[in-house]
């Protein structure tokens, strides 16, 4: 991974694509099993726990001391998040806490952008000993939080609530606006991914602050 965070990010995206469709494929093939569920969690841990924590760790500087190791906590909290998801019966239609793929995409896209645009604004933020450790801690807290977050996967059978419909529409609008901005400004493609998943977090946080207005 040294010198090629872009390759690591592409592989992470491939993992996210497979993760998106694996449940659907299992249902269509009638191949669901307990072993498959555990292997799915193991694959998620590697792709969306270990890999993003190492990518964010590599953005740090040895001179930061103990702060430079804070990004490695993402792997630990991702494991807790996956274990919680497997045991929590409340998370069939959506999530409680930030899903590991979303956390991973933020880490991966940031690492890829800093690598391709060393003189950019985000690169200057990442050069100091504050931004990366704080980002890592925020992601760790969100991973194990109880904040309701909508799922991007299809299926489930139950009708979506007004809150979920609002969040999906807001997410699509923010993503479209972010993509348009990236294209017009001719920015690195990884910024589009970073904007989308930052928007995913912000939409869910905003809706959590307005439970009465958005309740079904």
Predicted region positions:
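C-terminal membrane-associated helical module and adjoining short loops/tails
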Residues: 96-216
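Short juxtamembrane and helix-loop transition motifs at transmembrane-helix boundaries
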Residues: 1-7, 27-36, 58-66, 88-91, ...
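Helix-coil boundary and interhelical linker segments in multi-pass alpha-helical membrane proteins
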Residues: 1-10, 46, 50-71, 109-131, ...
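"…together with the soluble PPM/PP2C metallo-phosphatase catalytic core" -> "…together
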Residues: 1-5, 10, 61-93, 98-100, ...
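C-terminal ends of transmembrane helices
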Residues: 22-33, 78-93, 97, 144-153, ...
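Membrane-embedded alpha-helical segments that form the functional core of polytopic membrane enzymes
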Residues: 1-38, 66-75, 135-136, 193
